[in-house]
Amino acid sequence: MYKCALVLAAGQGKRIKSDLPKVLHKVCGKEMVNHVIDTIRKAGIQDANIIIGKGAELVKERTEEKNVTYSLQSEQLGTGHAVQCASEFLKGKKGTVAVFAGDTPLIKESTIKNLFNTHIENKNAATILTAIVDDPTGYGRIIRSGNEVLKIVEHKDCNEEELKVNEMNSAIYCFDIELLYESLSKLSNNNEQGEYYLTDVIEILKSEGHNIGAVITDFEETIGVNSRAQLAQAEEILKDRINLKHMENGVTLIDPKTTYIGIDVEIGKDTIIYPNNIFEGNTIIGERCTIYQNSRIKDSIIKNEVDIQSSVILDSSIGNNTTVGPFAYIRPESKIGEKARIGDFVEIKKSIIGDGTKVSHLTYIGDAEVGKECNFGCGTVVVNYDGKKKYKTIIGDHSFIGCNTNLVSPVQVGDNTYIAAGSTITSEVQEGDLAVARAKQRNIKGWVDKKGLKK
């Protein structure tokens, strides 16, 4: 059977008080609407249409890689009106369509599958995802007669008896596409808000004798984000889920409460994560690594048995058995080899560092290719920028760079070379050479007395 989805993402979200469309606020490093789309796809629904409105172009930009289509809701006149705006997407289709809110990032793949299966197996015209809550204030109520679903009443339109109902509408549904399409033209805005409610479709279908079903799920999954406080709540819930998944897969988190792992991050077994670490984007961390406190790693590949302490690694790769930090900064497009050492207060920018090379402290390497088994003394600087353009430096294998050396790019240093401490290198150093580029020391006798500086 054909399955598709509509994602309602047209609202600005006044309560969140932001210039950014509400659905583009991130939870665990990913936009809420993209959480919804990714979960839909995992549940086996490939055809999705996003209903956009406020900030439409920005929403399209942030979701363009998801292979979705779009419908425009120019005026926000309610959820029913939003689905009406997707009529062209629905027209002529047969099967089942699910409707999701773009601000519900906690919905699970298994719940979506269960909703579809229940809907199809029971041949329902509509199936509502619901939850039981102690305080349903603000939510639409599921009105039943026994176990039979009769209708959904929005909170502001509830009478005294309906307000006592604690089964709430999650705003996630499955519909028979043809029946939904026919019902959209029958919606009315005769209510307190003057809006077209998608929930009224339930009552329309029921009045026509169609079967309406409901699937009850955990309230946590249905939380819609309408404020910064709810955004933080969703972040905390999803963070706990992610951390639990990694611990179940063999990763040790010393303090899960202070460990922030993005939803797309992968971590190998027997890796140990200390407190106050942040892993973001498409980061992959291998097995048997130790990530000590206060590190941030984003969009990077960390191979096996790597030790990292109090460092920042962005869009780079670190080879097996390498150590990084403390207080190292690996900037984008850097590649660090195996068994290397990147020490304290070292900055690597857009450079390749060969296997076994040691850059132990207080060094800047930018736009460089460094061979294997090299050693950098303290205070080395690759001078790669002349104020207009950045230039490349190449350093061969087994080279020794003395302390306080400046390598003025573009420059090439051959294999097995030595550079004396304090040198400023401006031209090629050939293989096997020692380069000394510093002024000869000159001692001026009696200078302190002559200047009257003796104490």
Curated annotation (Swiss-Prot):
**Which CDD domains does this UniProt record tie to the protein?**
GT2_GlmU_N_bac (cd02540), LbH_GlmU_C (cd03353)
Where Mg(2+) is bound, by residue? Answer: 103, 226
Location(s), subcellular: Cytoplasm
State the EC number(s).
2.7.7.23, 2.3.1.157
Active site, per annotation:
361
Main subcellular location of this protein, as a coarse class: cytoplasm
Keyword Glycoprotein set for record: no
**Pathway stated in the Swiss-Prot or TrEMBL entry:** Nucleotide-sugar biosynthesis; UDP-N-acetyl-alpha-D-glucosamine biosynthesis; N-acetyl-alpha-D-glucosamine 1-phosphate from alpha-D-glucosamine 6-phosphate (route II): step 2/2; Nucleotide-sugar biosynthesis; UDP-N-acetyl-alpha-D-glucosamine biosynthesis; UDP-N-acetyl-alpha-D-glucosamine from N-acetyl-alpha-D-glucosamine 1-phosphate: step 1/1; Bacterial outer membrane biogenesis; LPS lipid A biosynthesis
Cofactor(s) it depends on: Mg(2+)
Question: What are the boundaries of the region Pyrophosphorylase?
Answer: 1-228
Coiled coil start-end: none
The UniProt keyword set, sorted, is:
Acyltransferase, Cell shape, Cell wall biogenesis/degradation, Cytoplasm, Magnesium, Metal-binding, Multifunctional enzyme, Nucleotidyltransferase, Peptidoglycan synthesis, Repeat, Transferase
GO CC term, one of those recorded: cytoplasm
GO MF term list: glucosamine-1-phosphate N-acetyltransferase activity; magnesium ion binding; UDP-N-acetylglucosamine diphosphorylase activity
Pfam assignment, any one: NTP_transferase
Indicate the quaternary assembly.
Homotrimer.
Q: What is this protein called?
A: Bifunctional protein GlmU
Q: Which gene encodes it?
A: glmU
